[in-house]
């Protein structure tokens, strides 16, 4: 009788060991094929050779210029306030494939670099600066599979400014150097129109400054 109980216990241990081996095999298979139960995948997904997608974006940003110094308020060569600007952006970014485990863990995070041209409608006194920057963004909230609220920050350098000059540009108390730092942060709605196209709309804040490395440096904020 004791011998039979020992055999039954041994058989039960073997069954448990087989179950553990099966679970381990499923986990290894899921890791190789990017399918994880804890991320909501019910079945094993097909193997995907590329874990990232690459994106190209074009943005148009009409901007309001905050009148933070006399030059922008109208004390300039034209005696007119500088109240608006416009920036065109070309951007490249990459991110994890949508609806994968990594995409859900990191909230749709993406990163990349961009190139922008900004005009203030006064090339003689301010110039039309060109900006190169890096950026990063992610999802804040998802309202449905196609619509989400996202954030993004940009950081880079802008060149092509017309700085203060005692003889030729003496009114410009906003910009003291030809190259300035570029800082930007914003939030926007992202609407996925199709597999290949997204439409975004939102607002942001931009600051141009040289960090007081050269004066005057009142800066420009939009």
Regions found by a protein language model. Name each.
Residues 1-36:
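Amphipathic, non-transmembrane alpha-helical stretches in extra-cytosolic proteins
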Residues 52, 82-88, 126-132, 177-183, ...:
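Residues that define the transmembrane beta-barrel architecture of outer-membrane proteins
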Residues 54-58, 109-113, 132, 147-155, ...:
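Transmembrane beta-strands of outer-membrane beta-barrel proteins
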Residues 58-60, 88-94, 134-140, 153-157, ...:
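Residues on the lipid-exposed face of transmembrane beta-strands in outer-membrane beta-barrel proteins
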Residues 60-66, 94, 115-121, 155-163, ...:
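Transmembrane beta-strands of outer-membrane beta-barrel pores
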Residues 65-87, 125-126:
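Surface-exposed strand-loop-strand hairpins of Gram-negative outer-membrane beta-barrel proteins
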Residues 66, 99-101, 195-199:
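Repeated loop/turn-to-beta-strand initiation elements of outer-membrane beta-barrel proteins
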Residues 74-79, 120-123, 169-175, 211-218:
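Extracellular loop and loop/strand-boundary signature of outer-membrane beta-barrel proteins
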């Amino acid at each position: 009788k004791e011998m039979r109980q020992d055999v039954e216990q041994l058989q039960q241990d073997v069954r448990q060991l087989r179950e553990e081996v099966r679970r381990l095999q499923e986990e290894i298979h899921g890791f190789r094929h990017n399918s994880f139960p804890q991320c909501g995948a019910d079945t094993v997904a097909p193997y995907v050779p590329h874990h990232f997608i690459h994106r190209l974006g074009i943005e148009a940003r009409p901007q309001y210029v905050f009148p933070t110094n006399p030059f922008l308020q109208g004390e300039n060569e034209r005696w007119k306030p500088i109240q608006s600007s416009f920036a065109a952006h070309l951007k490249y970014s990459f991110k994890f494939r949508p609806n994968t485990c990594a995409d859900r863990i990191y909230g749709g995070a993406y990163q990349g670099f961009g190139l922008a041209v900004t005009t203030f409608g006064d090339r003689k006194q301010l110039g039309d600066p060109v900006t190169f920057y890096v950026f990063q963004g992610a999802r804040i909230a998802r309202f449905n599979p196609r619509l989400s609220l996202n954030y993004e920050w940009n950081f880079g350098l802008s060149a092509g400014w017309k700085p203060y000059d005692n003889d030729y540009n003496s009114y410009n108390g906003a910009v003291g150097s030809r190259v300035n730092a570029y800082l930007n942060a914003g939030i926007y709605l992202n609407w996925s129109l199709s597999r290949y196209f997204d439409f975004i709309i939102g607002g942001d804040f931009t600051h141009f400054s040289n960090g007081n490395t050269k004066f005057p440096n009142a800066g420009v904020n939009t």
